């Protein structure tokens, strides 16, 4: 029977990439179907299951579960403290120096960003000022043009708007067809 990679991955409880990796480690000849999918036989599946089980057993044997006593924990704490004390003074100085250089760089970058923001705002203000001056010039030209021309008088209508002629209502097309 033929099996595809996802099926074997489910059986082993690993990802499809891990299945291909296991097959390569076992030097299995993997065939591909016309779509490029890997095809495994029953023998390949059995070999991979055995290999996977042996790997799991080896990992469990190399990492046996140990019960730690309070004495062991105390010993580890003292070892860690001595290591930290020995390394601390020199490493902390290096870390402090690195931190200072990083903060200086950040300050410089913030200043540069602030300068750029100020430049952008200044440019926008100048552009708005230029636009306002152009609009002021246009208004002055229009005023001068109006002063040269004859005064324009606006005469009110003789009839108020509510007394004006009303447009005839449009009849809907269906009503006109049926003569309603």
UniProtKB/Swiss-Prot annotation:
One of its GO terms (biological process) is chromosome condensation. SUPFAM superfamilies: Influenza hemagglutinin (stalk). Residues 90-150 form a coiled coil. This is Chromosome-anchoring protein RacA. Residues 5-25 bind DNA. It is found in: Cytoplasm. One of its GO terms (molecular function) is double-stranded DNA binding. GO terms for cellular component: cytoplasm. Keywords: Cell cycle, Cell division, Chromosome partition, Coiled coil, Cytoplasm, DNA-binding, Sporulation. Transmembrane segments: none annotated. Belongs to the RacA family. Required for the formation of axial filaments and for anchoring the origin regions at the cell poles in sporulating cells, thus ensuring proper chromosome segregation in the prespore. Binds in a dispersed manner throughout the chromosome but preferentially to sites clustered in the origin portion of the chromosome, causing condensation of the chromosome and its remodeling into an elongated, anchored structure. It comes from the Bacteria. It comes from Bacillus anthracis.
